[in-house]
């Protein structure tokens, strides 16, 4: 679940112990399996309410808590990001249609720790220009992860994402960002998707963050709807969103969430 980018000067960063990172890994595994459970249902004719109920039931059946549900009054277990919705869309009676795309952003709390991830799915056959947006956004996630190394800075992650996407003609949402994660869904530091190399907090051993590029086909400008949550592109062109929770431990970067379960469900439809 993306945070709001406030560009605060002072941030309180909580570094995790190896034992805490192990607990986060378990939460992230359940988060990953929840996303795959929803993937089984992504198809024309399915409502976003149905996807939300699938996730909620799966999380509860496996001993977790859907952390988005009730967070600041958010009404669902999962953020539903259909087409031009960038982040924080509500589950509803909306029925998926051929050619839609949908980002499913899910946060699971297990044993006091959170895992956070997002994957944008094609619904049936999708326009190739939109598919390329999705591929580029996912690739930019891994460009950011590649530079999430001890001794680097948060700005290195931001710049890697921004450079990769903008060089390919896409725009980067600036008002929303990734974030630290642990016992709380949203912790410091903020992790923007734009910025300069060599700036921002230093990446240290024990850092756990959610990296989540939100990339638009058209303009970077966004609008917050009257519900106070739903964020969409101003020009109503599609937006894509991919996210992993990562940890820095013993000088190595570990991706705690995984798309492998989703890949098993989607087969040759996996992006």
Predicted stretch roles:
Residues 2-271:
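Active-site neighborhoods and metal-handling regions in enzymes and metal-associated proteins
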């Amino acid at each position: 679940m993306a945070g709001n980018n406030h560009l605060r000067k002072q941030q309180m960063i909580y570094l995790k112990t190896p034992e805490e990172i192990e607990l986060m890994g378990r939460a992230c595994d359940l988060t990953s399996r929840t996303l795959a459970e929803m993937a089984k249902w992504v198809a024309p004719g399915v409502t976003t309410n149905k996807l939300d109920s699938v996730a909620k039931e799966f999380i509860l059946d496996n001993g977790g808590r859907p952390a988005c549900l009730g967070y600041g009054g958010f009404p669902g277990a999962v953020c539903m990001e259909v087409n031009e919705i960038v982040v924080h869309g509500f589950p509803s009676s909306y029925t998926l249609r051929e050619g839609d795309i949908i980002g499913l952003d899910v946060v699971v709390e297990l044993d006091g720790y959170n895992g956070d991830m997002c994957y944008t799915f094609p619904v049936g056959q999708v326009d190739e220009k939109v598919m390329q947006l999705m591929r580029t956004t996912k690739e930019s996630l891994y460009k950011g992860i590649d530079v999430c190394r001890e001794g680097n800075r948060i700005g290195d992650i931001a710049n890697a994402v921004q450079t990769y996407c903008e060089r390919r003609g896409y725009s980067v949402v600036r008002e929303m960002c990734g974030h630290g994660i642990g016992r709380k869904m949203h912790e410091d530091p903020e992790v923007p998707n734009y910025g300069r190399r060599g700036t921002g907090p230093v990446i240290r051993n024990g850092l756990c963050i959610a990296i989540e590029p939100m990339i638009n086909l058209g303009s970077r400008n966004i609008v917050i709807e009257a519900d106070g949550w739903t964020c969409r592109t101003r020009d109503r062109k599609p937006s894509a969103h991919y996210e992993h929770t990562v940890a820095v431990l013993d000088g190595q970067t570990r991706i705690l969430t995984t798309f492998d379960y989703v890949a098993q469900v989607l087969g040759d439809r996996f992006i």
